[in-house]
Amino acid sequence: MQVKEGDIFECEGSFYQAIKATTKTATIRPIESTFEGLADAYGWEHKYMPLPNCFICDPIMGREASDNGKRLKIRDYSRAKNSPELELCGYRLTLWDGTPSICDTYN
């Protein structure tokens, strides 16, 4: 599966949108997300949905990379080669599947 411009990646409640993409790399920028509710009965896990094209500053990426985009190598460890991933400062960003992203606030 090839990453396209506009594709959204997620990691524990944070979302990133591809602003440029080639077969081997993707340039991403962080985007806003909205709180959708609680994902568990105890209130520790929160659900978030992305707001495409609403770019923000991300402290993990830094201000300059957030404004200009950060170019990352696309990796796909799946057998069927249909699950592209990006790695950002040790965090694994997965292609968003359309469901709310879960952020565990218990830590």
Annotate each language-model stretch with its function.
Residues 1-15, 24-107:
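Mixed-charge, low-complexity intrinsically disordered regions
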